[in-house]
C-alpha cells in the first residue's frame, strides 16, 4: 500500500512524499524544511530522493536532507547537470524498485534538456513537464521536443494520476478557456478547481484521461485548438507541432 503525501513549499511548489508503512521517498525537494517537518510529524524514514530536473526550486533541499538521512539514495536525470551531488543518474527506460514499487523513468526533454518523469503504480511524477491544464516553459529544449514529451506522457493509461510540481492549474485553465471558450470540460474544470483553491486545497493529483479533455497542450490536433492558434499567429499551421509552438509562445505572454 502506497500513499502520496502533499508537501507545499515556497509560493506554489509541491513536494511529494511516497509513503510505504514508516518509509518514504521524496520527489523534487526544493526546500528541506517542510519535508523534515512532515517526516518528523509522521515518524517516517527517508529512503531515497527522486529528482526530475536540476532547477533550484526542485533540488535546493537535497543537501540538508542527505545530512539528516545520510543513508538515503539520490536519483536524478543523467543528462541534467548535478555537479554538487553524487547519486545514481537515470536515463530513459531505467527503473527504480522500492518496497515492491517499480517506477519507470521517462526522458521528457523540453523544460530542460535532461528532464525525466517517474511512472508506476498508476502515478506519474512529472516535475515541470506536464501540469494540470498546461505544460512547462521551454528553458532549454525546443517546442518539438516538448510536444513529443507530452505525447509520450499522454499515451499513458487514462487513470494515471498526475503529480506535477506546481499549483498553476487555475492560470492554466484560464489560458485554456481563451483558446477553447466553447469547451465545456474547461468551463466545468474552472468551477471545480476554483472551489478547491478557495478552500485552500490542492488541485492535484489530476487524472490523465480528464486532462485530455481540457489541457489544450494535449489537444493540438483538435480543430478548435488549431483555429485559435492560427488566429493568434495570423498564419496557417501545418501540423500539431506548429500548433503547440504557437500555444506555448502565446501562454508565455498571456
Swiss-Prot record:
Its EC number is 3.1.2.6. Pathway: Secondary metabolite metabolism; methylglyoxal degradation; (R)-lactate from methylglyoxal: step 2/2. Zn(2+) 2 binds at residues 57-58, 128, 166. SMART domains: Lactamase_B (SM00849). GO terms for molecular function: hydroxyacylglutathione hydrolase activity; metal ion binding. Thiolesterase that catalyzes the hydrolysis of S-D-lactoyl-glutathione to form glutathione and D-lactic acid. HAMAP family: Glyoxalase_2. Monomer. This is Hydroxyacylglutathione hydrolase. It comes from Aeromonas salmonicida (strain A449).
Amino acid at each position: 500500500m502506497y500513499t502520496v503525501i502533499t508537501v507545499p513549499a515556497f509560493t506554489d511548489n509541491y513536494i511529494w512524499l511516497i509513503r510505504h508503512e514508516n518509509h518514504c521517498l521524496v520527489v523534487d525537494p526544493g526546500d528541506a524544511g517542510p519535508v523534515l517537518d512532515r517526516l518528523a510529524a509522521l515518524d517516517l524514514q527517508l529512503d531515497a530522493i527522486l529528482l526530475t530536473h536540476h532547477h533550484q526550486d526542485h533540488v535546493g533541499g537535497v543537501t540538508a536532507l542527505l545530512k539528516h538521512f545520510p543513508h538515503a539514495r539520490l536519483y536524478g536525470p543523467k543528462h541534467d547537470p548535478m555537479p554538487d551531488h553524487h547519486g545514481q543518474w537515470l536515463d530513459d527506460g531505467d527503473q527504480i524498485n522500492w518496497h515492491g514499487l517499480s517506477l519507470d523513468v521517462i526522458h521528457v526533454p523540453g523544460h530542460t534538456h535532461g528532464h525525466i518523469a517517474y511512472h508506476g503504480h498508476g502515478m506519474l511524477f512529472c516535475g515541470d513537464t506536464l501540469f494540470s491544464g498546461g505544460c512547462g516553459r521551454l528553458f532549454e529544449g525546443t517546442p518539438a521536443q516538448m510536444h513529443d514529451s507530452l505525447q509520450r506522457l499522454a499515451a499513458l493509461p487514462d487513470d494515471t494520476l498526475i503529480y506535477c510540481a506546481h499549483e498553476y492549474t487555475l492560470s492554466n485553465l484560464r489560458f485554456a478557456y481563451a483558446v477553447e471558450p466553447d469547451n465545456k470540460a474547461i468551463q466545468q474544470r474552472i468551477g471545480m478547481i476554483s472551489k478547491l483553491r478557495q478552500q485552500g486545497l490542492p488541485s492535484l493529483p489530476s487524472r490523465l484521461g480528464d486532462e485530455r479533455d481540457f489541457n489544450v497542450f494535449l489537444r493540438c490536433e483538435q480543430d478548435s485548438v488549431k483555429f485559435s492558434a492560427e488566429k493568434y499567429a495570423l498564419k496557417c499551421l501545418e501540423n500539431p507541432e506548429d500548433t503547440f509552438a504557437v500555444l506555448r509562445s502565446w501562454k508565455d505572454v498571456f
